[in-house]
């Protein structure tokens, strides 16, 4: 028989025997701890720190308008700086073509068309055959000479600004190359390295460092170690004391955050800013070597330094990149831009332009500086020359008030068009967009030699309609001076009126 038939059915397997627990180095392993129930499984929440609080940045048109308004002026000043470096301040267009990269021109543009867009600043003259040169107009040259004279006359103020900048640094020493980034913003003379830095050894001296020459402070003046915020606080206290003496039974004043007009913050953001303001003020001229990086006290000191630097500038604004060059001297954090954005009650960061700009909020009112010095007034005159149109508009026919109103509407319309935002073409830089707008999108290869240099294919048409305008004016004058015409027959007899 088959062996399979002799097996019992159903087959019940024998019970498996378990092996004894193995020991690890002679001792049993402890059982893993059981996790706590779900309600008790809470992650530790870090303590709230004011310095790390995030504040959402919000666009503000008045400050962005300042950047947009200086868009053309920035290009013109670049052209002027290249021109004044030439002998007799005259330059050929062929030589100007070598500075395309400095002007921010990544594509070929018509330089002749670009220069003729600013007739109030540049004069394009012909010298010889196919030789074009350009120079400053008499009005633009006068403004340039006035600016040089004013910068040289204000040398004492420039020395005080350099001393205050050195007094705020940690080692009381700053590389001259870094100071040069703030040269125009502080109103320093063009050649301050060879003039201001060497003429006042009683205040600072030039020392040789591994990374280049540096400016080192030699005399500490306690009278200069007073920040603009402290002076403003003293004036505010004096004003409140006068009001307290004049007003009787005045209600108690509560500590509250006075936000600028138009600035909208959430309740949490306003609470964090209020807590930061209640912290004791740390002077930017005080010793900050003991302050720990990332702490609230260090950020309070950093905000004071940025506030003081912006107070020293001519227009109370500068580029954020210029401030980042001083990370080592002032121990700024790596996220300096984020730190400035976290305090919208003091600063405003504009993303308009190729590089971000930071404004001192208290120094502006509706996109205008509250206090303007002579350099700012000269810049406004230069902006007026830049705005001079190439082809003046024809005078409007009508009364003086109507013509004035029409010109005013045209001017306001041009101002609005210049100030409107153009965020669509993000691929090109702002300077490239401006050149494209001014030159009509044409390159140097688009024009021909000869008449194309002067005509540019956009000359104004001849005034064929002048006679019609004169006739219309005569008819209008005749009807206005005399009485209403009397209807008559062809033979002269008067007709009956209806």
Curated annotation (Swiss-Prot):
Question: What is the annotated localization of this protein?
Answer: Plastid, Chloroplast
> Could you identify this protein by its name?
Protein WHAT'S THIS FACTOR 1, chloroplastic
Q: Which InterPro entries match?
A: PORR_domain (IPR021099), PORR_fam (IPR045040)
Query: Which superkingdom does the taxonomy of this entry point to?
Result: Eukaryota
Entry's Gene Ontology cellular component terms: chloroplast
Q: Where is the transit peptide?
A: 1-50
User: What does this chain do?
Assistant: RNA-binding protein involved in the chloroplastic group II intron splicing. Binds specific group II introns and promotes their splicing. Functions in the context of a heterodimer with the ribonuclease III domain-containing protein RNC1.
